[in-house]
Each structure stands twice: as structure tokens, then as C-alpha cells.
Amino acid sequence: MSEPVVLVVDDSPTVRKIVQLTLQRERIRVVTAGDGLTALAAVADEQPDLILLDIMLPRMDGYNICQVIRKNMAYRDLPIIMLSGKDGLFDKMRGKLAGSTEYMTKPFDSIELAQTVKRYLDSPAARERAARREMLMQGRLRRQM
């Protein structure tokens, strides 16, 4: 089976790079997006196993991205972890109401982040998503030949 795929959505190139390096050490393929609309396109194109999603983004905020993703039945159990500098109770509740699975605050501990991501990626639902993605990618390759 192929490596799990995590979509990291953050407008900070530094945060994207730190998360990417952290997860690549765990043999996780990382796809990045710097704004909301690019993130939605990446969800459709890459079929990630998990999304790490900032809240404050250009073109569409993380709450709205989460709501759009959750409207698609294919992504109803896709883990979405909001990763934000906003640490108030209201922000966390708003994230849950938008459909996030979990909420972590920045600055984050790299080890804790990797453990949290791996916990979701090791679930039976994640393995099922990975198998569906692999079948989808094989179908795309056959159509290109």
C-alpha cells in the first residue's frame, strides 16, 4: 500500500515546511496549500487521508473550508485537525461546529503533532480511505494510457 497522504493548509510557508519535515520523517507524504481555494482543489485531486488546517487563511478561512469539505459525503469521516494560533474556547467550539475532528494550537510540539496524526492514520477508516485512493489513482493511470 502507498504512503498515507496529509494535506497541510497554512498561509505560512515556514509552518508548512516544519509540518512537512516532521511528517516526512514518519513516512507520510505531505501535500501543501497556502490558501482556502487551493486547499479545496487539493482535497479533490489528492484524496488525502487527513487534513491539517489553519483557520486564518486568504481567500477562504479554515472554518468555511471545513464546512465545504463536510458537505461532501465522501469526506464525512476524513480527519480534519485544525492547527491554529487561536486558542480561545470560542475558536475551538467554532472549529468543532464547522466539522473539525480535533483542534491543536500553535506553537505546536512536533512530536505531539506527529503522534496525533499517526493515531488517525492508523485507524481502520484511514486504511479504507487509502485503499480507495489507490484504486482511484490506478483508474486515472489506466485512462491516461
Enumerate the language-model features and the residues they cover.
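CheY-like receiver
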Residues: 122-145
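Charged docking surfaces used in two-component/phosphorelay signaling
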Residues: 17-25
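Short hydrophobic/Thr-rich beta-strand motif most characteristic of the beta2 strand and flanking loop
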Residues: 27-34, 42-43
